[in-house]
Amino acid sequence: MASSVRLVKKPVLVAPVDPTPSTVLSLSSLDSQLFLRFPIEYLLVYASPHGVDRAVTAARVKAALARSLVPYYPLAGRVKTRPDSTGLDVVCQAQGAGLLEAVSDYTASDFQRAPRSVTEWRKLLLVEVFKVVPPLVVQLTWLSDGCVALGVGFSHCVIDGIGSSEFLNLFAELATGRARLSEFQPKPVWDRHLLNSAGRTNLGTHPEFGRVPDLSGFVTRFTQERLSPTSITFDKTWLKELKNIAMSTSQPGEFPYTSFEVLSGHIWRSWARSLNLPAKQVLKLLFSINIRNRVKPSLPAGYYGNAFVLGCAQTSVKDLTEKGLGYCADLVRGAKERVGDEYAREVVESVSWPRRASPDSVGVLIISQWSRLGLDRVDFGLGRPVQVGPICCDRYCLFLPVRESTESVKVMVAVPTSAVDRYEYFIRSPYS
């Protein structure tokens, strides 16, 4: 039986504590792309110190939120479509970010496992209580064992993963009083014009936007069959073993693989094998690549808009499942190496109006690497989080940090229920 969550205070909108500009800000072409019209939703679980005063903690969080919204005032605005439908804007009138407080009979240990269903933890961020959902919603939930869950939702079109982590660390520092607003670095930078269309017409080939035939009823299966969340932790020893396997099955002369390359390849290969797809079905692995320092000139420090493009590894089911891990890791490496300034600028043009290219869903697995964002360092005075994860575990595959083990990675993804046992078998049997 799912645990209950109950609001204990009326939801409020928290405005910036100081006056902020009343203006309309344009989001970039990358921000406005159709692919990003969804929220980033984090779940941070804290082992609250004994005797913590709930009222004092909640008040401190609320005050820190109001202060952090001064430099990040667009998060207190509202997103709207431009009149000509060419993109999105943020109307900034200090409307406020959402703040909720709740209690639950969950305990911190409940979050050590995968959720029982994709939406089991949905009530830990009750965004639907707001008639118009703000770009930022925060929910503080007191657990039955005295621990605390912090749900945070960001409008992805306003901010990306790196930007959201920078905001959360500022928010937390202000809550503890460890830093003053004037001292915090990097200062948030808007400058969304830096990733706008320049009207280029000569664009290269971008497989992430290409369509492939659905030979297996892939879309139907992922939309109609129940998805079951999974959670598996890879420690340093396991990752080293994957690197050795990859090197033993790669072309002579390859440089050692990174943990991301081998883990992504292993997850992708295990996922594909578990689904029993036709040999000729084309599969794609998509993953975000930070372009802050890949574009020329580099984006300014503190740029918190969407500054990533999708790397795309593509192959057939036959090659992915029959060739070794080294082959998979090579595909991931090649996808990373293709991304430079020219590639990124072409993506900006591709997703801009009127082209509005968007990734296909046929044969696609998407990986998002939260393990390197610094979410495990977000301390509101309750210590560092004991668990970092998503509000909802769906078909997006997430790489998550592991407490007190910087070289370990927790992998969460939901797969069709009929494939769960096979997926977990192949994950744990890299030599098979």
Swiss-Prot record:
GO terms for molecular function: acyltransferase activity. Induction: Induced by ethylene in ripe fruits. It comes from the Eukaryota. This is Alcohol acyltransferase 9. Involved in the biosynthesis of volatile esters which confer kiwifruit flavor. Alcohol acyl transferase that can use a wide range of alcohols as substrate to produce esters. Exhibits acetyl-CoA:alcohol O-acyltransferase activity. Its EC number is 2.3.1.268. InterPro entries: CAT-like_dom_sf (IPR023213), Plant_acyltransferase (IPR050898). One of its GO terms (biological process) is alcohol metabolic process. It comes from Actinidia eriantha (Velvet vine). Coiled coil: none annotated. The active site is at H156 (proton acceptor), D379 (proton acceptor). The lineage of its organism: Eukaryota, Viridiplantae, Streptophyta, Embryophyta, Tracheophyta. Keywords: Acyltransferase, Transferase.
